Amino acid sequence: FHTDNETVWDYVNKYAEMMPYINKVKATVNGQVFSLPINLHTINQFFGVACSPDDARKLLLQKCDRTILEPQNFEQQALRFIGEELYEAFFKGYTIKQWGLHPSALPASVLKRIPVRFNYDDNYFNHKFQGIPKFGYTQMVKSIVEHENITVELCRSFAQEMRTDYDHVFFSGALDAFYSCQYGRLEYRTLDFKKILCQQDYQGCAVMNYCSIDIPYTRITEHKYFSPWEKHEASICYQEYSRECEADDIPYYPVRRADKMDLLNKYLSRAKKEKNITFIGRLGTYRYLDMDITIAEALQTADVYLTSLHEQKEMPAFTVSV
């Protein structure tokens, strides 16, 4: 878990004992293992040099395509800021597997989440507060919902007639599914996981990305490395496969494409006219959100709702910009 938001950090610490944990991701590229995000070690290892920070900056300037003044997509963004070689090695194949699209079909903003560091810092996240729940996220969520005012019903899908049972509904399901996909299905990605059992260590780290398009999975997670305070001889790993989300699959994250915005805008326009309902979360607002942002927006939404009750104002269908 990682965030710069102290309010969010305090919130999760109310429900879980957060242990110190720094996520350090490795990547297998052409038979070699590199550190991510791209840092000084990655640059020196990849190009077979021993650059200082200033030398590495100059090297990347030589590699970058500075003729691209205003990148219009992911690929152009990468070519302008890291150059063709690093883009081809670390991002092109991985991006195609993760999104099911060529990088030229994705917005440039997707790559802005991935930094390049001119030092040897291999902390994947550059956030003030970082940790992991000692007893896992399941325990944390269980602690959140164990409240006298909360009733959890499993294996029950939302139905429109349920709205009459409540003064206000907060809907975190898929936006198009709320309307039974009347205008067509929005695009999502889903994930498949293949378990690997090993009697020893499997890869020696928590996360190993596989950047080549020739390898069908995007990464392997070795779970005992997420809890280094525990001791395990054997190991459980999961290969992660990303694919298009079909109607009966669990949607993991939305794919916002510039050429599909007309369909999304139909749903957003209709949703904004709704009364007594607020759409929230990754699926409800159709945005790719990290966990800390999702929690921050949920807390903000709760505050807006309480204020609307106090001031007897109408609660909006969205409390964030969509």
Question: Model segments located where?
Answer:
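N-terminal FAD cofactor-binding segment of flavoenzymes
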Residues: 1-32
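Alpha-helical packing segments of well-folded alpha/beta enzyme cores
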Residues: 4, 8, 74, 91, ...
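Structural/interface elements that position substrates and couple domains in central-metabolism enzymes
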Residues: 10, 14, 86, 203, ...
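Conserved beta-strand termini and adjacent loop/short-helix elements that scaffold enzyme active sites
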Residues: 21-23, 153-157, 223, 280
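Active-site/ligand-binding neighborhood in enzyme catalytic cores
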Residues: 27-168, 172
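Mid-domain catalytic core of redox enzymes
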Residues: 156-266, 270
